[in-house]
Amino acid sequence: MEEEVVLMKGNEAIAHAAIRCGADGYFGYPITPQSEVLETLAELKPWETTGMVVLQAESEVAAINMVYGGAGSGKMVMTSSSSPGVSLKQEGISYLAGAELPCLIVNVMRGGPGLGTIQPSQADYFQTVKGGGHGDYRLIALAPASVQEMADFVGLAFELAFKYRNPAIILADGVIGQMMEKVVLPVQKPRRTDAEVIEQCPWATTGRTNGRKPNVITSLELKPEEMEKNNIRFQAKYKQIEENEVRFEEIHCDDADYLIVAFGSMARIGQKAMELAREEGIKVGMLRPITLWPFPTKAIAAYADKVKGMLVTELNAGQMVEDVRLAVNGKVKVEHFGRLGGIVPDPDEIVDALKEKLIKK
């Protein structure tokens, strides 16, 4: 397939991009608002073209363990779900991180806690960047703010996952998953051959016909000293990721007196709020974390001595704001504005919050 420009939903873009980047398998289960990922893959039937496996599992728990099996054999495999379903996957995600298995997880967030609502939310930030499962592990977390980024981040997530032998997650929200935009789909990449997988993934369970020694994929280590060594090695890897893979976007920050910090769909709304504020003569810039982990701590800290205040806008009760406050270390006032339960604010609400929380005080 050649490069193609189409109008589609963010969820549909995930499915198309997965096929075009040469993914080997998808294992998932339908749940609103991300069901179109599985539906689109079923409609496209990639098993007839690229050979990609697409399977609706009997549950979210089954799906994440199928990902474990596929990733253990060195294959490019993925799953997708929405907030309650991702909670069910947490044990498997911890196992994937502990076994150092590269894979892609997509979370199109909806409101909670509990069953909550099918409307958009960003309340899974803590779960994603602080470790939703057990143990000291990290996920490489990408936060798209457009349908184009939904498509682009699939290939990027796989690239980073295999580079560091670590699970990666695309943390989107229901707005980005359901909205329709023009998207440029990449040229079709072929799936890797078995020989390429063996060469690129010498750690994988690819069989012994090539004469190599057996590989064992596990996160289990019963000797405390060895488990500590594993964890120390993991932390060294995470530090390397933090040093090399931070991504963020800055808009009109050079002359800003105030900074809006937002990710995902809220960054789009925040950018419009920034423009409205500037029309009123208020110099506002915006910083958008693209990687939620590794977090752009240094980039945010650099503005602590340059701006009068920061407003963190999120579709939650205040989660990323904690990382922003840690970044500035008390050097500048940081306030939060959020809407809960699936309500998406207007840009005017953010401007009003900026005035009330930062300017009038």
Question: What are the roles of these predicted feature ranges?
Answer:
Residues 6-43:
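N-terminal glycine-rich anion-binding loops that anchor highly charged ligand groups
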Residues 9-13, 235-258, 271:
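Glycine-/acidic-rich phosphate or pyrophosphate-binding loops and their flanking alpha/beta elements
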Residues 36-130, 142-162:
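Thiamine diphosphate
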Residues 139-196, 349-361:
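Structural signature of the thiamine diphosphate
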Residues 165-250:
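Conformationally flexible catalytic loops at phosphate/diphosphate-handling active centers
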Residues 270-303:
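Generic long, charged, amphipathic alpha-helical segments
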Residues 314-361:
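Peripheral docking tails and interdomain loops at the edges
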